[in-house]
Amino acid sequence: MSGPLRKHHPLLKVVNHSVIDLPVPSNISVMWNFGSLLGLCLVSQILTGLFLAMHYTADVNLAFSSVAHICRDVNYGWLLRNLHANGASFMFICLYMHIGRGLYYGSYFYRETWNIGVMLLVLTMATAFLGYVLPWGQMSFWGATVITNLFSAIPYLGPDLVQWLWGGFSVDNATLTRFFAFHFFLPFMIAGLSVVHLLFLHQTGANNPTGLAGDVDKVPFHAYFSYKDVVGFVVLLAGLVFIALFSPNLLTDPENYIPANPLVTPVHIQPEWYFLFAYAILRSIPNKLGGVVALAMSIVVLFFMPFVHSSRQTSHNFRPLAQVLFWLMVVNVLLLTWLGGQPVEYPYIFLGQAASVIYFVNILLLIPIVGYVENKLLFS
């Protein structure tokens, strides 16, 4: 058979159509780089996590010591641990940028791709939460206790569900063991779902900044965009290595360097920085069940994006009013992130409630209204 092997070999053909001869709109910007960066982060996390798991002990009496042993006694264990812990932060930065790009340029109209992407977000958040528990420091223990306790707000099933999650009547050895098992398994599930995400994306083709059909002007992914992605890889890895070597504790909580003690509650229980926006929404509602529903809705609301979009234009590029709402949402999420790290007292309680209301009103009410107004101004 004539032609390159990659074009007719059963396995190489799949790779060829996915990353080499893939037709891509010629006008996509650097904002389309974050998907490949997330793939790099996932590979990095799986590899560093695999080597850490070889030395970690999932036992409440030994977990904290085993992490200290990895950092002190294992060759380059400190580097593996720093890369893994900070790699999670970099992965969430890329993830939020990827979602932001999708919201700005209307990628949610590719519904299967978008819905699987939101599922990937939920799985990644679950994996990160489980990983935060494993070092068995103070914030690990109390974070696990507080977050798993939220399931008790579910009517009728709640208390039994919490005991089933714990494997007993409190967060203990059974909890840590199953959290480690799921933390090890979920990244492979994320990798599999990412392949499905790409499969659906390549069925429709990539979006582009204009929001218009890009079929008239497409170029092969390699070499036009593969080299562009490599630049992103270099920048991301340089940033990750810099943080891991020079300031590895910049994004971590000092409270987690104290071994878990069920008898001493930390002054301020909080998750890692990338969950603080959702945590602020949870805390803003005084009712437990209401807070859990609001927490879930802060992520689930992304599923509604194709339905609340009422404008005839896909992208925000040519929609000044919609751009104002988008940047209001960005600033609001940053404000919620800051508020999630503040103590539960005035004025942070009121500010958190106001920011939470703005978050949902913006997405569920203002976006459809502005789309309708723009249609009237432009097309009537």
From Swiss-Prot:
GO molecular function: metal ion binding; ubiquinol-cytochrome-c reductase activity
Residues engaged in binding a ubiquinone: 202
Keywords: Electron transport, Heme, Iron, Membrane, Metal-binding, Mitochondrion, Mitochondrion inner membrane, Respiratory chain, Transmembrane, Transmembrane helix, Transport, Ubiquinone
UniProt keyword Phosphoprotein present: no
Alphabetized Gene3D superfamilies for the sequence: Cytochrome Bc1 Complex, Chain C (1.20.810.10)
Family: Belongs to the cytochrome b family.
UniProt name for this protein: Cytochrome b
Species of the source: Branchiostoma floridae
Gene: MT-CYB
